[in-house]
């Protein structure tokens, strides 16, 4: 038996340096990543049997949502269609990256800030699985970015919100005016 002792220097957490121009975008964490896949069932098997994720939900578009801990989903898969972007080497492409912000109130400020900067909002509101209000836009290279808040958490019983409670909303205002059961923004 080998015994080892390690000393780890504890450092103070670093704070984010202020941008040259203030921004209301303050990311708490990378929330989830969505991939286009060529075979949804093969990929679902990989993410569950190899990577250890659990399926939270499937939606009517064939998407599969996976969780690793409490968030409703941290990985999601979308079936590739004819017009799905494809990388130069023929691989199926990235769908989007989602970043969590602190609150729905912050989302309103972020949306207004993005618009003032001339960035087109391609989606805002609340989709189905996960119940999280969000704002989506493209980065300069055309990658879809989602900023969101208040994602559903999956409890110890492993059950997520039933589909009949998903209540989609097409604006942030609508999402706040009609919160999901048990949610206060």
Segments from the language model and where they lie:
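Short secondary-structure junctions
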Residues: 52-58, 121-124
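Conserved short beta-strand elements that form part of the metal-binding/catalytic scaffold
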Residues: 4-10, 54-91, 138, 144-151
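Short phosphate-engaging motifs
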Residues: 42, 73, 106
């Amino acid at each position: 038996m080998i015994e080892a002792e390690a000393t780890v220097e504890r450092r103070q957490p670093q704070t984010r340096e202020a941008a040259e121009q203030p921004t209301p975008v303050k990311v708490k964490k990378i929330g989830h990543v969505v991939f286009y896949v060529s075979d949804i069932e093969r990929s679902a098997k990989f993410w569950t049997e190899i990577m250890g994720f659990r399926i939270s939900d499937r939606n009517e578009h064939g998407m599969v949502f996976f969780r690793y801990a409490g968030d409703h989903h941290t990985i999601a898969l979308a079936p590739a269609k004819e017009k799905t972007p494809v990388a130069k080497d023929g691989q199926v492409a990235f769908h989007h990256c989602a970043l969590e912000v602190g609150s729905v109130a912050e989302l309103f400020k972020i949306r207004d800030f993005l618009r003032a900067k001339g960035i087109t909002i391609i989606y805002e509101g609340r989709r189905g699985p996960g119940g999280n209000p969000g704002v989506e836009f493209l980065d300069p290279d055309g990658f879809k970015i989602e900023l969101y808040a208040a994602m559903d958490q999956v409890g110890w019983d492993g059950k997520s919100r039933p589909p009949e409670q998903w209540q989609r909303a097409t604006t942030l205002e609508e999402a706040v005016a009609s919160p999901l059961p048990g949610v206060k923004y």
